[in-house]
């Protein structure tokens, strides 16, 4: 049983009451089948339109829970929290080992998608907190030596190939293997469905990223370390629904966020600006059929070079049964 101090217990009680004042324990939750990144022990679950993020390390769990609770008081209106998944509190649930684990309850961002395409992008020039050991800093820097230069890296993606009716899935090593001149191609992979570049999606994603950037430029309370941006869109172009309802761009994985006073998060801003710049470049290139074909060929070549093949897989689409979870 995890031991919390009085302040931590207050945060946990507040979060548990927010979701369900009766404190009932969930039993019918299922593994989440669209996780493309995250630590191997942090397997998400789903329940009635919610995503359940489990307690793995108690201190980090409470920190993230505390942050979401703070957002609820600082930003009382939902539209003020547009950059985050909707937060519902915390809950206890039975594990497959018949133990009881606490979970953070968030909205399922894939709920409006029949065939969701998902990319997880680790943001910031620095993916470790300033207080960690020199060894930890070195290990984090070695994960992707271009993180400081580029300000982000792809930690996992799955994109639907409409021609083959299957998913292309990459793991964490794919993103770490991208050289600076390959990053555009890595991002392009996510917006191609084998037939065309999803310009309709790209426009919305750029708009939403700019909204987050504008918020980051004025907020001076939070420094986000080891946090990601999750981008989701509907992969089935045969649906006649408006694509904008499926496109989600959210900041996730907030456990390593530090509260500060009077400082903008320059590392995160650097990464956001570069990410938006790459996507603008991709959009510009797609204005001619010749450039679009050239970029698509570059993407195909990228995922078929010997160094990349071990990091890319293909799985047939069977409803919502594709699972890919790995440490980021």
Q: What positions do the PLM features span?
A:
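Polybasic, positively charged surfaces/segments
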Residues: 1-328
